Swiss-Prot record:
GO cellular component term, pick one: ribosome
Organism, as annotated: Cupriavidus necator (strain ATCC 17699 / DSM 428 / KCTC 22496 / NCIMB 10442 / H16 / Stanier 337)
UniProt KW keywords: Ribonucleoprotein, Ribosomal protein, RNA-binding, rRNA-binding
Subunit structure: Part of the 50S ribosomal subunit. Contacts protein L29, and trigger factor when it is bound to the ribosome.
Protein name: Large ribosomal subunit protein uL23
Molecular function (Gene Ontology), one example: rRNA binding
Coiled-coil ranges from the UniProt annotation: none
UniProt keyword Ribosomal protein, yes or no: yes
Lineage: superkingdom: Bacteria
Chain's role: One of the early assembly proteins it binds 23S rRNA. One of the proteins that surrounds the polypeptide exit tunnel on the outside of the ribosome. Forms the main docking site for trigger factor binding to the ribosome.
HAMAP family according to UniProt: Ribosomal_uL23_B
Family: Belongs to the universal ribosomal protein uL23 family.
Gene: rplW
Biological process per Gene Ontology, one example term: translation
Pfam name, any one: Ribosomal_L23
Length: 104
């Protein structure tokens, strides 16, 4: 496993937003996982370090998903949605991230 540079500025840029969807909430309830949208150049070690730094929790594992943007029609023009990189973060037993309490 590679050593992660403890550059706090870089780690603050890794996590972009939590993913709020039906699938993400099912995964969170069933498997104690949290889904984040992450930077396109982020790796598993950086995501793990960023979650542990920002939320003060212990991470068990990280799975990365590269989602291609869909082709969509805008009027008579064809376009494409942006590509997205997601991270499924598994927390150790007993750990929890509460986004409502973090916002206060």
């Amino acid at each position: 496993m590679t050593q992660v540079a403890k550059n706090d500025h870089r780690l603050m840029q890794v996590l972009l937003a939590p993913v709020v969807s039906e699938k993400a909430t099912l995964v969170a309830d069933k498997n104690e996982q949290v889904v984040f949208e992450v930077a396109r150049d982020a790796n598993k070690a950086e995501v793990k370090a960023a979650v542990e730094l920002l939320f003060k929790v212990e991470v068990q594992s990280v799975q990365i998903l590269n989602q291609k943007g869909k082709q969509k029609r805008f009027g008579r023009f064809m376009g494409r949605r942006n590509h997205v990189k997601k991270a499924y973060v598994s927390l150790k037993p007993g750990q929890e991230i509460n986004f409502e309490a973090e916002a206060k």
